[in-house]
Amino acid sequence: MKKTVLVIVALVVAFGIYVRVAPFDLATWHTDPIEAPEKRKGGYKSTLVLESSNAQSALEQVVSVAAEWPRTRVLFGSPAEGRVSFVTRTRIWGFPDVTTVSAVAEGQSVTLTFYARQRFGGDDHGVNRGRVSAWIAQLQDQSSTSK
């Protein structure tokens, strides 16, 4: 019995370590959010149009907003590239969610496309939608106060 408990504890600890150190593949996670599926279980896709002609500047705003979000960091890309992928981890287990944002300038506006999805599990219980919605709300607030 004691041996079984130790094996179970070891497996739980190993899984906890794995979700924190497992590498991310650039080709899998830093994909174009415009081409991402509209519906994916545990995923969320949304767009925001800003009055700006500078895609890089718009993505710099996104990076600034994401930097304020707990346990979030840039995973791949940069505003200069036109696409940035962020990883946000859950508080206790450190499960990663990836949010990729692209910016496309068209005339005097920039369309930001957000695509958030979890790496492990089947359902994120609306966490990705909540995060993207909060980022969009903050960007809209910044946009309206800068006018």
Spell out what each predicted region is:
Residues T4-V7, F15-K147:
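Ser/Thr-rich, low-complexity intrinsically disordered terminal regions
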